[in-house]
Curated annotation (Swiss-Prot):
It is found in: Cytoplasm. GO terms for molecular function: leucyl-tRNA--protein transferase activity. This is Leucyl/phenylalanyl-tRNA--protein transferase. SUPFAM superfamilies: Acyl-CoA N-acyltransferases (Nat). Functions in the N-end rule pathway of protein degradation where it conjugates Leu, Phe and, less efficiently, Met from aminoacyl-tRNAs to the N-termini of proteins containing an N-terminal arginine or lysine. Keywords: Acyltransferase, Cytoplasm, Transferase. GO terms for biological process: protein catabolic process. GO terms for cellular component: cytoplasm. It comes from the Bacteria. It catalyses: N-terminal L-lysyl-[protein] + L-leucyl-tRNA(Leu) = N-terminal L-leucyl-L-lysyl-[protein] + tRNA(Leu) + H(+); N-terminal L-arginyl-[protein] + L-leucyl-tRNA(Leu) = N-terminal L-leucyl-L-arginyl-[protein] + tRNA(Leu) + H(+); L-phenylalanyl-tRNA(Phe) + an N-terminal L-alpha-aminoacyl-[protein] = an N-terminal L-phenylalanyl-L-alpha-aminoacyl-[protein] + tRNA(Phe).
Length: 194
């Protein structure tokens, strides 16, 4: 099992865990380039704004953490492997019970159709994963996360490793040294997530 104190210490040092889908062993990752979101310059897409105005989705915070992390761990259309092992689910569920890990959930007609989860430390939020069972469900949840972080005064939204989906949402890559500088600054802030 991943020890909670070890997990939190790793985040403060710029590491995050990933499980190997073949052996489920947990590895500590610290990529040379880090994907982050500039909270001040984030702008939702027109489609997200349209769906938000239409109130097609209902978004909640910390209502269904277990459903979100299991949705993130489930196989996807183009990728049947997952880095989210049972050990990782157990650790983040414990962090959630301690008020450190949080989820945003997107609901459509009463059904959980998307969401994301991550952990909050100081003025940093570490986005772990997102999932969507209906078009735009994870983007709507992400939009709510960004506005929540802005409202609370967060400085850093860490998305870890760049991928095409994060790039479409507006993530940028920064060098390791710059990431560590931003992380150190963000961790000095005292912010209550809820």
């Amino acid at each position: 099992m991943i020890r909670i104190d070890e997990l939190l210490r790793a985040y403060r040092r710029g590491y995050f865990p990933m499980s190997d889908p073949e052996d489920e062993k947990v590895y500590w990752c610290q990529p040379y380039k880090r994907a982050v979101f500039c909270l001040d310059s984030y702008r939702p897409s027109r489609d997200v704004l349209r769906l938000t105005r239409k109130k097609e989705f209902t978004v909640t915070l910390d209502k269904e953490f277990a459903g979100v992390i299991k949705g993130c761990a489930a196989p996807r259309k183009n990728d049947h492997e997952t880095w989210i092992s049972d050990e990782i689910i157990e650790a983040y569920t414990k962090l959630h019970s301690l008020g450190i890990a949080h989820s945003f959930e997107s609901w459509y007609q009463g059904e959980l159709v998307g969401g994301l989860y991550g952990i909050a430390l100081g003025g940093a939020f570490f986005g772990e994963s997102m999932f969507s069972r209906r078009s735009y469900a994870s983007r709507i949840a992400f939009d709510h996360l960004v506005f929540h972080l802005r409202e609370k005064g967060y400085l850093l939204l860490d998305a870890q490793i760049m991928n095409p989906h994060l790039q479409r949402l507006g993530a940028v890559e920064i060098e390791h040294e710059e990431y560590m500088r931003q992380l150190a600054h963000a961790l000095q802030k005292k912010i209550v997530f809820l």
